[in-house]
Amino acid sequence: MNRARLIDFWEAAPETRHFVFEADGPVDFLPGQFVSVVAELEGKHITRAYSIAAPPNGARFDLCLNRVDGGIISPYLFSLAPGGEIEWKGPFGVFVWRKPVSDSILVATGTGITPYRSMLLERLPLEPDRHFTLVFGARHEEGLIYRAEFEDLAGRYPNFRFLPTLTRPTGSWAGRTGRVQSHVFEVLGERRDVDVYICGMAAMIDDLRNSLKEKGLDRKKIIVEKYD
C-alpha cells in the first residue's frame, strides 16, 4: 500500500473538489489512468477508483471527485486538511492515448472530464498536427468542471476545440444545449478515421457507443471508461 499527503485542494464545481497529493516517491503513470484510494470499514478494506487529473509531475498526483452522500471514501477525502494522508494503490487502467495518436473526439459528462485534463495537458504541446475536440456535457453551467482552463487551451492551441453543452441551461446560457451524443455526430460528420474516447456514466457510454457503431465507426476506434 502507498501513502500520500494532501498538499492543496480547490472547489472545481458545486460538491466537486480537485485534490493535489504528494506521495513518498515518484508516481509513474500514463495520462488517463486512475488510482484506487483505500479506506478501512469494519475491518474490511474498501477501495474507490479515481482518474488522475493532471499529467505526471514527480511525486504528485491530482484527483477530482464529487462528494457522495452516504459514501465512504469521498466524505473522508472532503474532510482532509492539507497534511492529511491517504492510502492508495495503482496506477491502473487502459484509458490512455492509442498509438499512434490520431485526430480524436473526447466525450465526457460530469467528472468523466477528469482524465481528459491529464491527457490534453500532456498531449497538446506534442501533437500540433493532430486535431482534438472535447465535447463536455453537464446539467448546469456551474457543473462545467475546468471550463476556464479548457477555454484557455482552446485559445492557445488552434488544433483544439472545446464544446460544452448543457441539458438544463438557464436563460443566460448562449452555448450548446442537449445531450453530448448529438454534438459528437456534428463533429464526426462523415469521418470514420478518428478515435472517439468516451468517459462518464455507463448509460451515456453504451448509448453513444452503439450509435457510433451503427454509423459505421470501427469498434476499435471507440475507447471507453465507465464510472459506474
Task: Please provide the spans of the model-predicted regions.
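Ferredoxin-reductase
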Residues: 2-82, 139-140, 167-168
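A short, basic/flexible loop-to-alpha-helix module at the beginning of a structural domain
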Residues: 89-101
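Short, compositionally biased
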Residues: 49-59, 98-110, 215
